[in-house]
């Protein structure tokens, strides 16, 4: 990837207006709302109210898993999402039916290699791929297997202010995505951690 390009930064698992506005003002490029089953799940109605209060130029992303495509499109339209992040077994055909840009979640296992990751990505025509060892797992994966992948990849899973510089220097990804690594508790962000995380990313 282009090492001169500014790394995109998403704070995921937003559940309240205060956190959404604060992380936006601290410099996040995007914020994520989880509509799949999760301890950070949010209702479309609540997400819509939060998005209406956001400052301009913040990308809003909805996280879904194996939902009916018409349901995803309906929520995306109602909430005014900019993109959808699909973390299930959604097929390329399914992704092509989305009325928003798609970030396809790629589950990274301990048995994966660079070749197997590329195999999982083939046949998809999406805006980006997010490599994650499991939604909200708080664990990292072996970053070495993603070295040299010439696709727009976003790294997630176990990221924190302490390790995000390492993964950026190793992979030069399109973006990084953090949730539990900047939380006080499920669904509530620790702004000191958020600020430090963003500072670390921007210093790369």
Locations of the language-model features?
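Conserved N-terminal beta1-alpha1 strand-loop-helix module at the mouth
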Residues: 1-131, 136-204
């Amino acid at each position: 990837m282009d090492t001169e390009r500014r790394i995109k930064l998403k704070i995921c698992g937003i559940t309240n207006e205060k956190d959404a506005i604060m992380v936006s003002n601290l410099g996040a490029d995007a914020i994520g709302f989880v509509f799949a089953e999760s301890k950070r799940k949010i209702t479309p109605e609540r997400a819509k109210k939060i998005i209406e209060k956001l400052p301009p130029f913040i990308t809003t992303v909805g996280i879904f898993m194996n939902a009916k495509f018409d349901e995803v499109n309906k929520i995306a339209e109602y909430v005014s999402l900019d993109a959808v992040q699909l973390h299930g077994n959604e097929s390329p055909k399914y992704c092509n039916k989305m009325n928003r840009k798609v970030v396809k979640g790629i589950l990274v296992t301990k048995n994966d290699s660079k070749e197997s990751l590329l195999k999982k990505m083939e046949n998809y025509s999406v805006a980006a791929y997010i490599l994650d060892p499991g939604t909200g797992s708080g664990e990292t994966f072996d970053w070495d297997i993603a070295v040299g992948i010439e696709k727009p990849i976003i790294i997630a899973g176990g990221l924190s202010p302490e390790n995000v510089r390492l993964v950026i220097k190793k992979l030069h990804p399109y973006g990084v995505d953090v949730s539990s690594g900047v939380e006080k508790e499920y669904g509530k962000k620790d702004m000191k951690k958020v600020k430090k995380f963003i500072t670390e990313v921007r210093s790369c």
